[in-house]
C-alpha cells in the first residue's frame, strides 16, 4: 500500500493543479450504476481506504541547479551543493515542514574538481558521423527532377574520456575546457545516380565456322549506381549467326581437365627418412673401412662439415616435394560428362605432377625493446624511438603470403632522475665590423676617386654562427684576458630566425673649424699688462672660433691661428681717447679771435674698452687744440673732417700708411679788414699711420701627436670616462708650436708674444686594448661513414672557428689559422653479401604407386621437381648470417625447379652452346646450337624443328649512337669563383652579379633503335654550352654639383642654390634617380640659406667742395651756388673702407647725393656750421612726432648783415620715409645638409634670421638687436637623409638534387635569399632569385611485365590451365608519351625488382579455358576514369569512384540457365573530375533523327541523361499531312508553307492551305494612283495548345468561302489616314525656324598636357 502511495505521490509532482483524489479526476456527477461499478471493483475499497488514510499532498520539494565543485585537492573528492525548498503546487514557497522530510532530495553530493592541468588528461572523443538520414517532411512533395539532392541529418557519438586510460569520464570535466562539440549536423543525400554504361562494341565473329552459331557484343560500366540508383542493364547482347553448312559432323565432345589438388606427401616421411638414415650409416661404415689414405679421410671430413653447415642453413627452408593430381573428363556441349573414349586423342593429359608442400612464414617472438634512442629530455621534440626485432624461423615456400615485419618501432620518452636536458642550439653573432661608407657609394661616386675620409651613414656587417645554447656561454667581452666562447656547430642545427648580418651605422663627420674675420689692429701694447718689463710691445689683431671643429685630432687642433702680432715701440696698456672737441673758446674772453678747443676724452685699454680713468694716469693727457673763432667779415672754415682710414696696414720700403683729413671754406672774408681765407693746400692735412713694419708674426701649431701612456697618471688600473667614452688610462699628447713670420717661414720664438704661446702638452684618454677573440674550433666534419665501391677520391674533413672580436688599440692580433683540414682515414672495404646456390638435388618423381594406374605411365621417368640448398656468403666467401643476405643480397634464388627424367620415347637434346662471336657491322646476327642425343636422332617427332629447335639466332649489339639536344636552355649562369677562407670577418660588398656566363642545354644520346642510352656513349659530357651575357646594372648618373650661386640678397638673409643635371638614366636594375625637381624633371636642387653683410660694401663720400656761386657778386663773392663731392663704393673691412669697387655692389637707393644747392654767406652775414645728424624718431612712427637737426653759429653777422637763422630744423616722422619699424623674419629651412664626405645619415637643416625694415628692405641685424626684439626661433635642426643601401643577396645555394632521377625533364635548382633589403635610392633586388639548369640526361630503366599469354590447357581443349608472362628491362625517357623499349636485363641489374610497387613477381597464374558451349565471364574491363559526385560542375565532397565490369559470354543458347551473373567492382579514388551528361541529336533525315546521350569528355553512354528531357527521334504526323502546301512541324502537327494560311476543321485538323491575298495600298507621293502590293508574311503563326490545334486569329479576316470580309477594308483605310496624320505631325515638330547665324568664338582653349614625369619627354 505504501509503495503504491509513493508512486502516486511522485507521479503527482509537477502537475498543473492539485489532485484531491482519484475520484476527482472523473467528470461529475457520475451516473449511479457507474459509481457502484467503480466501488465494487476489486481493490476499489483499498484505494478508498488509502485515500482516506493518506490524502494527496499539496506541497512538493523543489531543487535548484548544482553549484560549483569545491574542494582542497584536484580530482574526485570535491563537494557541490544546491538549494532545496518546499513549494506549494501552485508555485509559492512555504515552510520545509509542510513537505515530507523522507522525500527531501539531497542538497549535497560528491563531485570531480577540475583543475587546469586536467586539460592534458581529458578530452572529447568524437565518433564518426553516421549515415545521412533524410529529414521526413510530408508537406513537401519531391520534385520530378532531382537538381542537387535531398537535405538530411547525421549524428555522431561524443564522450568525454580520460586519455591515458581510455575510460569514460563525466562531460562536465571536458566542458570546463572546451564546449561540447555538435552532436548532429546537416548533410546532403545526393540525387540517385543510375548505372551508366558505354556503347556496345562491334559484333564478334560467329561462334561457329559452319552451321548456326552465336555472335555477341559487349559494353562496360562507366559509372556504377549510387545513392539508390537503378542497377546496370545487361552488358552483353547476342544474335544468331548463320554460316555455311557443315560438311563434317560437328565436334560434340571436348577433353576437360580439372584443377590440381593440394600438394600432399605420399607416405609417412619419418619412416622413410629413418630407413634412409640407417642405410646411409651402413654405407659410411663401409666407406670408412675401405678408405685408408689420411688425405682422403680429411677431404671426406671437410665435405661432411660443409654439408652439415648447409643443413643448418636449410632449416630455414625445409623444402618438401610431394605430388598433386587432377581429373580428366570428356564432356559434351551441354556440359555433361561422357566416357573418355568419346574424346578421341592420341595422348591424354597427365593427371599427376610433383609439387612443393606449401609452408607459411614463421617468425620468432619479439625481442625486448631496445633503449630509447633519445637519452635526453627535450621540450620541443620530446619523443625518441625504440626498436624490437624478431627473426625468421621458416621461410614461406609456395605461399603467396609475405612474411610479417621483422622490426617494429614506437615513440618513447627517456624517463628517470638521471636524464639530462638535450642540447639546444641558438644563433650567435660576431662583433660588428667597422662602419664603412664605401658600400653605399654609387658606381659614379666610386669612380670619382678619394674614398679615404668618408663619413656619415654607413653599413656594417657581422657573421652569424650556430652554437650549443645551453653551455656556459660567453657573457660579456670586457676583460683583457683570453675570452672563451662556444665552438661553432653545423648551421643546420639552429632552426630559429637568423639574426641580421647587416645594419646601418654612422661615422661622425668632422666639422671644419670656422673663424671670424680679423679684427682691426690694436694699439701698441705690452704682451702682459701685468708684467710691463722692457719697452718691447706688439700690435695685435685677433679672430675667434665661430664653429668648433668635431671629429678631428683635437678640439682646436685643426683651427688656424687666432692671433697675429707686429712688434712695435713704446707700448702702452692704457691710453686716452678723444671722444669729441668742444666749442672754440676765444682767449681773454673776447667774442672772436684766437682761442682753444678742449678735447673730451675717456680712458681705454688695448682692446678699445673704456676703463677707469685712473689707469691712464701714466698716459699723456691730450692738450687743448688751438682754434680761431671768426670775427665778422673774417674767412670762415668748416671743422676738420675725420681722418680717413689708413691707406696701408703697415709701412715698408715701398709702402707707407697715410691718413687724410680736409675742411672747406664756408664763407669768404670781406674786402675790408677781414682775415683772408688760406690757400687750397691749407685746407687738407696728411699724417702718417701704421708706421710699424710689415712683419707679422704668429704662433703656428702642428697636429696633436699620438696619445701615449703617462706613467705618472696611469698607475691606477681603473676604467674612467673622458668625454663620455670609456678609457682604461689617461695618457698625454704633445704638439709642435713654432713662431712663423707671414710669407717668410719659421723664425725665433722671441719674435712672437711668449705669454700668448699655445699649449704644447695636454692629457688624453687611452682607449682599452681589445685582443682578438676567436671561438674554439668546431668539431671535425664527418668522414663518409658508409663505404662506396669504386670511390677512390680522397676525402677530407675540416674544422673552423670564427673571430668574434677583432683586435683594436694595440691588442693581440689574430694570428692563429681559422681553418684546418686533414685527410680522412681510408674507409673499410665494403662488405657485400651474395646468395650461394648449391647443386640441384636429384629429380623427384611422383611415386609409382600414384602414377601406375595412369595409362601410358612409365616407372622411373617423366616430369618431376628438384630442390637445392642456398646459403649466405660474404663477398670473400666467408660464412654470413641469412639475415644479411635478406637485407643486402637481393631476391632469393629459386629453391625448386621442374625437372625431367627422360623416358625411352622422349626426345633428348644437349644444352645450348654459347652464342657465336659477332663479325660485321649493325645488322649482323649471332647463333647458338644444340643437337639431338642418342636414339632421339632417329625419331621423327624429335626432328620437328618447331617443337625442338636446334638453332637460335639473335641480332648482334650495335654501337651506332647519335646525340641531339633536348629541352630548353638554362638560365645564364656565371662561373663560380673560388671560395677562400680569409683571416678575419667577411666584408659585405657587391657580389658579382653580371658579366659573361654560360647557359646549358641537355644532350640526349640514342642508339640505332631510338633507345635512350648514357650520354657518354656519344662522347658527350651531357651539355651544350653557349656563352651569354648578364647585363651589369647601371646606376642613375648625375652631373657634378654646380658652383653655389650668389646669395639671392646682397643685404640680409637669402638663399644660394646649386644643382645637378641628369646625365644618364638607370638601367638593368641600377640605382634609381633621386626625386627630381617638380618643375624641371632633369635637375636636382640643393638650397641653403646665406647671409650677406649689409655693411660689406658702403658708399664713401669726400667733403663737399667750395660752394661755387652761380651769380657772382663781384664785390662780395657771395650768394646762391652749387657744391659737389665725390661718392665712391668701397669694400668695408675691420680697419675701415679699403678698396674701391664697382658701384653696383652698393645699394643704389642709399647712394648719397653728389651735388647740392648751396648758399655762400656774404662777408657781413651770419655763418653757421654744417647741419648735424638727424635725431632718432621715437617709435612707433606717427605724424605727431618729429625729428630735428641743429647747426652752430660760427661767425656773427655784422651790423648791416643778415642775422643768424634758426639753427634747429624739424620734420615730422613719416613711416617708411624717415622713420622705420624693424622686425625679425626667418627664412625657410634649407635642404638637409651633409658633410661633403658623407653619402647619407644624420645631417642638419638651417635657417637664418633676417632683420626687415617696415618698407620690406633687409637691413643689418644690429637694427633689430638694438630694439631688443625677441628671437624664439630654432635656427638649426637635425635631419636624416635615407641611406641608399643596395640590395644584398646571399651566395647561391648548392645545386639541388635533380628533380627527376632519370629522363629528359630533370632540373637542378639553386636559390639565393635577400640578406639586406634595399633602402632609399639603393639598387633594388633582382627578380631572379632561382636559377635552374637541366640535369644530364639519364635513361629510365625499369622492370615491366609483358602481356599475359593466352590460357594454355596442356593436351586438352578446356578446363583449368595456366597463363604466363615475362618481365623485361625497358628503357624510356621519362615522359608520359614515350613508348618503353626493351633492353638487355643487365641495364636493370642495379634496380630492385619491383613492379608497380610490388616486390612479389607474379609470372604465372591459373586460368580457366571454357569448353565449347560453356557460358563464362569475360576478362575484367579496365578501370573507368575517376568520377566525382557533382552538381553544376561543383564537387559535393563525396570523393571519386572507379568501376570495372565483367560481361557474360554465351556460346550455346541451351546453356543460358548455367550462366553466372555479370560482375561489377568499384574502388574509391581522389584525382577525379566532374562530368556532365547531355542529350545529343543529329540533323533530321525526313521525319527521324538519331538521339543519344554523351558525356562531357565526348564518350557516348547509356543511362546518364534524364529520360524526361530526351528529345524526340521521330516527328511524323498522324494522320499524315496530305493537303497541298502543308508540312509536318516539330510539334507533330500539320502547318502550311510560307504565303499560305491554315483553314482548320472543327476537330482542329488542317483542311486546306489558302493563298494569302495581295493588299493594294496607294502611295503618298504619287497621286496618279500607283499602288504598292503587300502580302502578309505568316499572318497566322501556329501555336501549340493543349488540344494540339493550330493557332487561329480571334477575328477571322476570311469568310467561309475564303474571301476577305468587308470590315477588313474599313480597317485598312482608317489605318492609312492615321499614318498620314502621324507623318505630318512629325514633320512639323522637327522643322526648325531659320535663325541669324552667330559668329562662333573660335578662341583656342589652352592645351593641357598630362606630363608623366619622364625626363625624356
UniProtKB/Swiss-Prot annotation:
SUPFAM superfamilies registered for this protein in UniProt: TSP-1 type 1 repeat
Membrane-crossing segments per the record: 1608-1628
Key words, A-Z: Angiogenesis, Cell membrane, Cell projection, Coiled coil, Differentiation, Disulfide bond, Glycoprotein, Membrane, Repeat, Secreted, Signal, Transmembrane, Transmembrane helix
Tissue specificity note: Detected on kidney podocytes along the glomerular capillary wall (at protein level).
GO cellular component terms attached to this protein's record: cell projection; extracellular region; plasma membrane
Domain of life: Eukaryota
Name of the protein this chain belongs to: Thrombospondin type-1 domain-containing protein 7A
